[in-house]
Amino acid sequence: MRLQVIIPLIILLIFSYLIFIFPFEVISSWLGRSTSLQETILSTAFVYLVCLYYFRSKSSNKIIKLFVYEGIGIGTLSLFIVFFILLISFILNINEAQKIFIFFITFIPLIIYGFFNAKNVSVKQLKFSHSKIKKKIKFIFLSDIHIG
């Protein structure tokens, strides 16, 4: 296989683990349940194959679309919060119960904020005038659009 094909597949595999699996493995370990290497490999492979199928086929299956896009959102937020808690735990002595509490006290409000913020799209109309512009021109500038 060519490198142009292999590199995106490797990136998707790493992405699948870091976004979908790793944060929840860490949370699981904080709850006292460690995951085996076999569980990690199987769950990462499952997520990888679902994401690969979705991105390659552009499937319109609502369940797969929900799994991929909502999973990316929840997983990314979880990854950043878990990473932040792990960094803090190197500096301060925090037990597992406190880590779980910090995670949920941060995660739930951020998810609620993100949900409501996504529903509130802002539209601004700007008018420019200049002596060198003779024709009336209209254009649209779309910024930070996540189509899904």
What residues fall within each predicted segment?
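Non-catalytic terminal accessory segments
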Residues: 1-121
